[in-house]
Amino acid sequence: MPDLKNLVEKEMLELVHSDLGYFTLCLFAPFVEETVFRGAVLRTLLPRMKSRWAAIAISAALFSLVHLNPAQMPFAFIAGLLLGWLYSRTGSILPGVAYHWVNNTVVFAMARLLPPQIINGHLIDLFGGDHRRMVLSVIFSLFIFLPAIYQLNIRMRKA
């Protein structure tokens, strides 16, 4: 039986470096995935479940499972929660498609531009092995991300 993790990684790397890679991963995939997981799955679950967050969590779990790569699943689940929240707040898949496009484009660019040892390594490798710099960067990112989500939530309540 083939090693699924290595097979998925190999297929993704080949796709990133192919002529259709950007179209497939950054334009087509976000539209299709948002249509399926937010436009169909979440839209169906929201009116049928008592808890909005339970519906969002189920669609996020399905979204993460479809990515097939165990290393991607935790991030895909968290992204699925954010995308589900965006859909539940706006009733539209378009904000999710935009977020998904930006995310996939950044990952695509990193895969094309950064050396393979960085791409195949760990987060700490991006910081030259310096744990302090990595932790400070993550904390700094959270200081930007969390207030941004809070402000977005406030502004969406007013709308």
Where do the PLM segments sit?
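C-terminal membrane module of polytopic membrane proteins
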Residues: W101-A159
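Hydrophobic, membrane-inserted alpha-helices
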Residues: I56-F63, I78-L82
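Membrane-interface helix caps and helix-loop-helix hairpins in membrane proteins
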Residues: L65-A71
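Membrane-interface helix/loop boundary segments of multi-pass membrane proteins
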Residues: V32-I58, W85-S92
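Juxtamembrane helix-loop-helix connectors linking adjacent transmembrane helices
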Residues: M1-T35, L42-R48, G121-L126
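Active-site His/Glu-centered metal-binding helix of metallohydrolases
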Residues: F31-V36, A40-V41, N69, V102-V106
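Residues that define the loop-to-transmembrane-helix transition and helix capping
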Residues: L20, W53-A54, A71, I93-L94
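Hydrophobic residues within alpha-helical transmembrane segments
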Residues: F28, I58-L62, P74, A98, ...
